[in-house]
Amino acid sequence: MYGNYSHFMKFPTGFGGSPGHSGSTSMSPSAALSTGKPMDSHPSYTDTPVSAPRTLSAVGTPLNALGSPYRVITSTMGPPSGTLAAPPGINLVAPPSSQLNVVNSVSISEDIKPLPGLPGIGNMNYPSTSPGSLVKHICAICGDRSSGKHYGVYSCEGCKGFFKRTIRKDLIYTCRDNKDCLIDKRQRNRCQYCRYQKCLVMGMKREAVQEERQRSRERAESEAECASSGHEDMPVERILEAELAVEPKTESYGDMNMENSTNDPVTNICHAADKQLFTLVEWAKRIPHFSDLTLEDQVILLRAGWNELLIASFSHRSVSVQDGILLATGLHVHRSSAHSAGVGSIFDRVLTELVSKMKDMQMDKSELGCLRAIVLFNPDAKGLSNPSEVETLREKVYATLEAYTKQKYPEQPGRFAKLLLRLPALRSIGLKCLEHLFFFKLIGDTPIDTFLMEMLETPLQIT
């Protein structure tokens, strides 16, 4: 039936205890299906025809410690006298006779325990229910799901927070009953006294909460020290001083509006810009490290950013004005006047994208000064002898502004980002204003003062 296997089955010399041969070894099919030992090592095993009548029962237990996938086959007729011949291609591993005797001595109806090292078939899909594993997944106080070990005990977030609040606020509770209230998942909030006592009984440590608080305080102090030392080169106090030093006096602001002026809005804006250009140089000199740059680089930076610096200044000054802007000269320019003069489009952008936003977030003068310093330290300005130094100064202003907003407005974590979002709008509006001024200079029907004219005659220094 199976023929001779000598042409394809080869085993090492002495394999399975058989005599050594110099060439290949011819084996019978029954020997090939064994574990490698010759069948004569099991004298009780003989070839049995498949058709022999026999009542069989399958016991759902792995056969040996190797984890065979086949079930033990036993007979109601007593111990087996042989093995069933398996179909070709299936290897039935014959167990040692000692294990087979143990299995056969057990009643078929009895629950057979798995051999050491193997999981039982009946409980393979069930999670571990050992006491140690349950402790890690259940809150020791109320029995809810544990989120980890807190203050020395596995507990849920609710009991962890309750214990921490009790210790930090030094709370004192009283029990309305006999101080033996049931504390479980459903009733843990009914009696705070008994809940706290159970926390202590189960092993929660008061000192663990106090140590955690001390570590948090030390970490906050360390971060504050690092922040202050990192911003010593660009203190926000000096930036604020620069803003206040060049701020127009309040008494110079009158109730004048466009009806009190004989000039058109564009002329008034140009006069105010020329006046502010003189104070702009003084402001820049007060910004930390600006004067440390070469004189040539100082001039380049001022020429590159003067328009944005002035627009930011009068926009912030105008947050208290209704539907208009307040110039440094004290004049109010109303929206309707700007539209009649042909500059309504850019005027509307100033009110919408700058003045309104500054008003909504209540931008203070320190934040305004930092934004203007960021504009001033522009490493992209053409012709700089040391752009990397300018970029370093800008980054220091970034860090100063971020630290200031975190300390002054801790309830507004996104404030720093909102401030920086005003810079693209400021750049875009500044470029548009330059286009208008160049146009007015070209047609020559608007008087432009000396300093402003000098700025306009210089090629634009922004990439």
UniProtKB/Swiss-Prot annotation:
Keywords: Cytoplasm, DNA-binding, Metal-binding, Nucleus, Receptor, Transcription, Transcription regulation, Zinc, Zinc-finger. Residues 21-33 have a biased composition (Polar residues). Residues 231-459 form the NR LBD domain. GO terms for cellular component: cytoplasm; RNA polymerase II transcription regulator complex. Residues 139-204 bind DNA. Residues 211-222 have a biased composition (Basic and acidic residues). Coiled coil: none annotated. Residues 1-138 are annotated as: Modulating. The keyword Metal-binding applies. Gene3D superfamilies: Erythroid Transcription Factor GATA-1, subunit A, Retinoid X Receptor. Residues 17-53, 211-232 are annotated as: Disordered. A zinc finger (NR C4-type) spans 139-159, 175-199. It is found in: Nucleus; Cytoplasm. GO terms for molecular function: molecular condensate scaffold activity; nuclear receptor activity; nuclear steroid receptor activity; retinoic acid-responsive element binding; zinc ion binding. Acetylated by EP300. Residues 205-230 are annotated as: Hinge. GO terms for biological process: cell differentiation; nervous system development; positive regulation of transcription by RNA polymerase II; retinoic acid receptor signaling pathway. Composed of three domains: a modulating N-terminal domain, a DNA-binding domain and a C-terminal ligand-binding domain. Belongs to the nuclear hormone receptor family. NR2 subfamily. Homodimer. Heterodimer with a RAR molecule. Binds DNA preferentially as a RAR/RXR heterodimer. Interacts with RARA. Receptor for retinoic acid. Retinoic acid receptors bind as heterodimers to their target response elements in response to their ligands, all-trans or 9-cis retinoic acid, and regulate gene expression in various biological processes. The RAR/RXR heterodimers bind to the retinoic acid response elements (RARE) composed of tandem 5'-AGGTCA-3' sites known as DR1-DR5. The high affinity ligand for RXRs is 9-cis retinoic acid. This is Retinoic acid receptor RXR-gamma. It comes from Sus scrofa (Pig).
